[in-house]
Swiss-Prot record:
InterPro entries: CoA-bd, NAD(P)-bd_dom_sf, Rex_DNA-bd_C_dom, Tscrpt_rep_Rex, WH-like_DNA-bd_sf, WH_DNA-bd_sf. One of its GO terms (molecular function) is DNA-binding transcription factor activity. The gene is rex. It comes from Clostridium perfringens (strain SM101 / Type A). Modulates transcription in response to changes in cellular NADH/NAD(+) redox state. HAMAP family: Rex. The keyword Transcription applies. The keyword Transcription regulation applies. This is Redox-sensing transcriptional repressor Rex. Gene3D superfamilies: NAD(P)-binding Rossmann-like Domain, Winged helix-like DNA-binding domain superfamily/Winged helix DNA-binding domain. Residues 17-56 bind DNA. Its main location: cytoplasm.
Length: 212
């Protein structure tokens, strides 16, 4: 299976949805499924699904469809879920704690190694047996523990400073929950989760019927 060059971000963002739904099929002991059946369940057209998957190889068989387990494993491999990623959370407030306690991350290979906060009253408190540390120790911790992913859950005013510490520590990717677009070097990958923007999109959809 060889990844083709120039895969669009739209295709990449659809892959996790395929992966999640295929897992549900396996949990229900469903062994195979057609692109048409996938289309009806996921909401993308059958043609779109086939085009997406063809970007990475030929997975289906005409007249048979897709082997669910095989496709699940192939998509997991494409997404990079075949190894572990050492991860830290910065910001031990409500969002940070919710992420730390989300068990599926560990199953997917995201290994939480450290939690950091700026509030001294939080230091030493444990979440999932991991003690919250002073954010001033972040850069050295990232360097010493081969941390690849930093999850930023701090207020907007502190987010860029935290980001800079992560970058200086050698981080490779940032999952950003702060309502700010971070300034990072070109080789650092950032995935933003701006909750207020998602809510505003929902409000628009509640008030308009012009979305195709």
């Amino acid at each position: 299976m060889e990844k083709k060059k120039g895969i669009s971000m739209a295709v990449i963002k659809r892959l996790p949805k395929y992966h999640r739904y295929l897992q549900e099929l396996m949990e229900n002991d469903i062994d195979r499924i057609s692109s048409k059946e996938l289309s009806e369940k996921i909401g993308f057209t059958a043609s779109q699904i086939r085009q997406d998957l063809n970007c990475f190889g030929d997975f289906g068989q005409q007249g048979y469809g897709y082997n669910v387990k095989e496709l699940y494993n192939n998509i997991g491999n494409i997404l990079g879920l075949t190894r572990d990623y050492n991860t830290v959370i910065i910001g031990a407030g409500n969002i940070g704690q919710a992420i730390a306690n989300y068990n599926s991350f560990n199953r997917l290979g995201f290994k939480l190694k450290g939690i950091f906060d700026a509030n001294p009253r939080m230091f030493g408190i444990k979440i999932r047996d991991i003690e919250i540390q002073d954010v001033e120790k972040l850069k050295d911790f990232v360097k010493e523990n081969d941390i690849e992913i930093g999850i930023i859950c701090v207020p907007r005013t502190n987010a860029q400073k935290v980001c800079n510490e992560l970058v200086e520590g050698g981080i490779k990717g940032i999952w950003n929950f702060a309502p700010i677009d971070l300034d990072v070097p070109k080789d650092i990958r950032v995935e933003n989760v701006h909750l207020s923007e998602s809510m505003m999109t929902l409000v628009y959809l509640l008030n308009h019927n012009d979305v195709k």
